[in-house]
Amino acid sequence: EKSRALAILKSALDSQQGEPWQTIRLISEFYPEDSGLFSPLLLNVVKLNPGEAMFLFAETPHAYLQGVALEVMANSDNVLRAGLTPKYIDIPELVANVKFEAKPANQLLTQPVKQGAELDFPIPVDDFAFSLHDLSDKETTISQQSAAILFCVEGDATLWKGSQQLQLKPGESAFIAANESPVTVKGHGRLARVYNKL
């Protein structure tokens, strides 16, 4: 039955245009026999531009199809696969834990609040906070009352605390212990910060 359903889906690709069909065409090149090909019919197809963010509650099925993104997760002891993978899929566990709640794609996007060189992204849970910081030659202070992870999204960043100094290039990160806040930063580019608002 799976093969027949996939054959019917693939035959529809010839006569359908736009989304979700464009995404189904894309993923069928990599996973031609995967049940996950039906996912774009059930889920929102969201294209994020640089600097945009979205929030998904736990138990929400999602996939990253192309490009580069920074994912921040709350503390969790599991990841359940739903498709688009050669790995084992525990269907009974998946069905028991996934919540399907209809929502327009634009309601998934978070609208940042700009405060000087910082973009603060409101998160509707207490597990973490997220912000982006645009850097310049002007020294700025980054502080929080919790530990933090600083990730260099683009450009370069120099962090220092007292006599300690650290250079970050794109893709590199630093862990800042709660007792090390605040730190001073400058550079050219952008830092992402994940922390807790206490």
Residue spans for each PLM region:
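N-terminal non-catalytic cap/leader segment that marks the start of a structured domain
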Residues: E1-G18, F128-F130, K169, S181, ...
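Transition-metal
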Residues: E1-Q16, P86-N106, F130-L132
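Short acidic-glycine-tyrosine-enriched beta hairpin
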Residues: L43-F55, T60-L65, L70, H133, ...
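Conserved short histidine dyad/triad with adjacent acidic residue
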Residues: K114-A117, D126-Q144
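Generic C-terminus detector
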Residues: E154-L198
